[in-house]
Amino acid sequence: MSPKFLSLLTAEDLKDVTALDVGCGTGQLALTLAPLCRRVIGIDRDAEAILKARERTGALSLHNAEFVIADADVEEYTAWAPQLVAARLCMSPAIIARSGRALGPGEVLAFVCFHRDQWKETGVVSRFAFDEGEIRALLEGHGFTVEHLEIEREVHQFASAEEGVAQAAGLRAKWESNGRWQRYVEFLEGGGRTLTRSHLIVKARRR
């Protein structure tokens, strides 16, 4: 998890805060926040991920963290009354809109999301990826003032096409299903020798 992202969260006084982790997966972010917050709720539509998050909570003996099966793009967040909404690699216009409705003045939405340059060598832009202007406009349009926005980028460089294939081997099955793999191989065969990981780190405060 990005140290910069964590520092943006922990810069807030969290001891009396109810935090909502949207798209929580198996709970990594929520369980990191739990010792710092009054209460943490993680939501995800993946029932298996929620079960694992609950198991991790029990193993850590955390009593202020709970995990709920819910679609972050569909459910309204007001029922959980959060003072902080956080997300890691789960972002959409619907999430920003729901956060804007749930948070009060001065309260924070903080997240890491895919930048449009994520895996740019594959020639496919994720529908969950944004550039700086897009994310700023969405936030400002839903009542937020952007306090921090930066790109965290890592470019892997390879000496050969074979090395590039090996670097992305863990992504092959997923990329074959969405058309990325063949384009990435073509990029390497054409002389390309990079693979870019690029995220936006954002903190915004409700006006």
Identify what each model region corresponds to:
Residues 1-17:
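Conserved alpha-helix/loop element of class I SAM-dependent methyltransferases that forms part
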Residues 20, 26-74:
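Class I SAM-dependent methyltransferase SAM/SAH-binding core
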Residues 74-84:
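A short acidic, Gly/Pro-enriched loop at the edge of an enzyme's catalytic core
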Residues 82-96:
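A short SAM/SAH-binding and catalytic strip from SAM-dependent methyltransferases
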Residues 96-108:
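A short glycine-rich, Lys/Arg-flanked "PGG" loop and its adjoining helix->strand segment in the class I
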Residues 108-134:
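Conserved class I S-adenosyl-L-methionine
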Residues 136-151:
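A SAM-dependent methyltransferase catalytic signature shared across enzymes that methylate proteins
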Residues 150-207:
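Conserved Class I S-adenosyl-L-methionine
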